[in-house]
Amino acid sequence: MNTCRVWAPNAREVELDLGESRTVMTRAARGWWSADAPLGDFDYAFRIDGGQPLPDPRSMWQAEGVFGKSRQVDHSRFQWTDQTWQAPPLASCVIYELHVGTFTPRGTFDGVIENLDYLRDLGISFVELMPVNEFAGSRGWGYDGVALYAPHHAYGGPAGLKRLVNACHERGLGVILDVVYNHTGPEGCFLPQFGPYFTERYRTPWGPAVNFDDRGSDEVRQFVIQNALMWLRDYHIDGLRLDGVHAIFDQSAVHILEELAGAVRRLEAELGRHLFLIAESDLNDPRLVRPPEAGGYGLDAMWSDDFHHALHTVLTGERDGYYEDFGRLADLAKAYTDGFVYDGRYSAYRGRRHGRP
C-alpha cells in the first residue's frame, strides 16, 4: 500500500476520496493527516469536514486542471538519458527565456523540443522556462499558478516536462525554471482551505503574503522548500529563478531564502551535479548573493534591473515611472561594472535612497 498525507491543522476530519470509496484519515502531530492508498498512479481528492472534494496542495498532476482531482505520479518510471550531464557555470552563459504556451503554435513541452536545435544553434547555454505549474485555464503567463507541484496539463504534464529537460540536456542545453513563492493566483487556489498558507501580517500587490513567519509557518516553509527540491531532483532542472523575492516577507532568525539555499546545497552534494538559485529583486541588496558566513542568503545570482532600465532608457529615451532614475550612459556603465546603479544613492522616483553597496 501507499500512504497519502496532507497538512490540514484546523480540520476536525479529513477524508481521502478515491471516487468509488472514501477513507477517514488519521490525524498525527502538527496537523498532518494520513491514510493508506493504492500503489501506482491513481486519482484522488481530500474532503475537509465533509466538504467538497479538493485537490492535494502537493498534487503532482492535475490532469483535468486545477478544479479536477489530483493524480499520483511515480517519478521513477521515466527513463532519463542525461546521467552524465553537468550544467555549465552561470558566469559564462547565455540564457534564453521562453513561454511554453506561446513559443510554438502547439504551445506544449513537445513543441519546444521540436525547436531545440534552433535554440542550440543560436549559441545559447540555458533555456529558461517561465512558470509551468498549474494555473486556472489553459492560457496564462504562469505567474498566477495555484498547484505549485503540478506541471500544467495543457503543456504536457509531468512526462512532457521531463521529456523537454532530457532533450535539452542531450543537446548540451541547461534548463532554468521560473518559480513563484511570493503569491498564488486568485482562481483555483484551495490552499487557505487546508491551512495558514498565507498571512495578513504583510500585503503584496497580489493580496496576502505567503506565510513564512507567522503561526503554522514551519510547514509552509517546508512546502516551498520541498517544491524547489522536487523540480531539481525529480525533473532534473538545473536552476530556479525565484520571482520577486522583494515580496517574500520573513522576519525569522533564518530567512526562508537562506534556508532554501542551504537545502539546495545539500541536494547538490547528494546528486553530484551543480544546481543554482537566481533571485529577481528590486531591492538592490547584494546580501542575496553573499554566502551565509558573510551575512548573506547564499543565492548564486540575481537579476540586475538597473542594467535593464539603464539600457532601455538610453535606447528609447523613456523616462516615465521608475525609468525617471535612468537615462545617462554613465548609468549604463555603472550597472555593467558594479551591478547596481543605485547602491545607496538617492532615487528621485522613490524619493529616498535606494540600494546597498
Predicted stretch roles:
Residues 1-3, 24-97, 102-107, 118:
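The feature marks proteins involved in alpha-glucan
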Residues 7-14, 39-41:
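Short proline/glycine-enriched turn/loop motifs at strand-loop junctions of beta-rich domains
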Residues 48-83, 171, 189-205, 318, ...:
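Core domains of carbohydrate- and sulfate-ester-processing enzymes
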Residues 96, 177, 279-280:
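Short glycine/serine/threonine-enriched helix-capping/active-site loop
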Residues 257, 261-357:
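Conserved alpha/beta catalytic core and glycan-binding cleft of carbohydrate-active enzymes
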